UniProtKB/Swiss-Prot annotation:
Keywords: Cytoplasm, Elongation factor, Endoplasmic reticulum, Hypusine, Membrane, Nucleus, Protein biosynthesis, RNA-binding. This is Eukaryotic translation initiation factor 5A-1-like. It comes from Homo sapiens (Human). Translation factor that promotes translation elongation and termination, particularly upon ribosome stalling at specific amino acid sequence contexts. Binds between the exit (E) and peptidyl (P) site of the ribosome and promotes rescue of stalled ribosome: specifically required for efficient translation of polyproline-containing peptides as well as other motifs that stall the ribosome. Acts as a ribosome quality control (RQC) cofactor by joining the RQC complex to facilitate peptidyl transfer during CAT tailing step. The modification Hypusine is found at K50. GO terms for cellular component: endoplasmic reticulum membrane; nucleus. The lineage of its organism: Eukaryota, Metazoa, Chordata, Craniata, Vertebrata. PROSITE patterns: IF5A_HYPUSINE. It is found in: Cytoplasm; Nucleus; Endoplasmic reticulum membrane. It comes from the Eukaryota. Its main location: cytoplasm.
Amino acid sequence: MADDLDFETGDAGASATFPMQCSALRKNGFVVLKGWPCKIVEMSASKTGKHGHAKVHLVGIDIFTGKKYEDICPSTHNMDVPNIKRNDFQLIGIQDGYLSLLQDSGEVPEDLRLPEGDLGKEIEQKYDCGEEILITVLSAMTEEAAVAIKAMAK
């Protein structure tokens, strides 16, 4: 019976988000808008009306797609804030549009897609020239994306 259990693929049960009161959110911070992890680019608060609470108007840009999302919530309500991790990994290969990155543990995951646009072209160009580069990977809410590159320190 106990031999049937497989714990290798589980996580520690950590939540992908944590609650924060709407009035405590700040511009350039992060928040979940319409189910997407976003960076807050605009924020405005309205005064308490005759019927109800002060409201906070949030405008955010999705950290993965760049799409714009808006939401309005009472300042006393809680909003979800995504747990965001930012890590640098050494690029060791590109195959079929996916990056092979060397992690600190020595593992080499090959499931991160090469970003589209200028960043993807720059990564390919530097890799083809034989440059050693670090890829900055942003992780939030079970999604990952390469967001920046930098030269490796010699």
